[in-house]
Amino acid sequence: MGSSLHGGRWNPKGVAVVYAAASASLATLEILVQYSALPRDFVLTEIHIPSGVLIQSMNERDLPPGWQAFPQRSITQELGHNWVSQGHSAVLTVPSSILPSEQIYLLNPSHHAFEKIRFLPSTPFRFDPRLK
């Protein structure tokens, strides 16, 4: 899992977390800020989270100043690591650092309810070449 190999905004290296965006448009923005050239080999995967799976939420007002900084600061990685370690939920929503009014879904693969989350078949995704 890529996020555990390198770490991310919400997890330090060695802590597995699956990142998902609430919409395809947000996923596109999140990918575009990571790459200097348009990626060619991406797919979109819809995720179904059953109603019985607890989803915790962290709002922008819950976060410390500078949480959006790039590169990411260790404080957000600590928050994510604590969430994984405590194991209260399989899913945590957090604001996107690009568009804080939109949500990123963090999935904890080590949580017992993770197996209830369904990943639907992926579809190829082509970035519009006008996005540069």
Give the role of each language-model region.
Residues 1-41:
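Long, hydrophobic N-terminal alpha-helical segment
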Residues 12, 38-132:
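Active-site and NAD+-binding cores of ADP-ribose-processing enzymes
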